[in-house]
Amino acid sequence: ETDVHASADGVAVIAHDPDLSRVAGRPQRVDQLTAAELARLDLGAEQHLPTLAETLDAFPDARFNIDLKSVGAVASAVEAVRAAHAVDRVLLTSFSERRRRAAVAQLPGVATSASGPRFAAALLATVVRGGPLVRAALRGLHAVQIPVRAISLDTVSPARIRAFHAAGVEVHVWTINEQPEMRRLLSLGVDGIVTDRADLAMEVVAALG
């Protein structure tokens, strides 16, 4: 899973935050600097902000879950995915339904997960046990990517996982960094875990066979 913003010259770059304060100690926004300027930033340990194109090229066999963090990120991410011929190995998503729809419109057939409003509608539909309503809220999607709790509800109860699966989507849970919680969620039947500790997750998956 990775987040994407657009540089000042319209290049998709891998960045979670809209500005560089946390990663580079600088107040500028990502969209105020060109891709070349961002590439010259020293993030320590000889690291820099990679572009989405560089990342897709560096890991040609990997599948990417891409969160479009800004309006400008939509067209730039679509361009990078299309240029890399990577439509079949990415999932594009956003908390914004408008951004999600825009990306899907430009990349027909690309996998996508529920935006914030679509997931909220599906979650509330599970409260009234409205199977048809859950399916309607998630129609055309491939996954829900969710925290363990939302709107004061347990989003990954066995009943809700069944309801989401019945609607034809996978259930991915974020952000899980402890192995006991990874094991618990996988035992409940979730399909994916978003984590900062891929090493720990791989140990859990290997142990489960």
Which residue ranges define each predicted feature?
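Glycine-rich beta-to-alpha transition loops that act as phosphate-gripper elements at the mouths
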Residues: 94, 117-118, 173-178
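Short acidic, Gly/Ser-rich segments with clustered Asp/Glu that frequently serve as metal-coordination loops
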Residues: 1-13
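Generic enzyme active-site microenvironment
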Residues: 1, 15, 65, 194
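Short, glycine/acidic-enriched loop or turn micro-motifs at the edges of active sites
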Residues: 4-6, 20, 70, 178
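C-terminal active-site rim and adjoining tail of enzyme catalytic domains
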Residues: 44-49, 123-209
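Beta/alpha (TIM)-barrel catalytic core signal, keyed to glycine-rich beta->alpha loops juxtaposed to Asp/Glu
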Residues: 109, 114-131
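Metal-dependent phosphodiesterase/phospholipase catalytic core, i.e.
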Residues: 16-115, 137-167
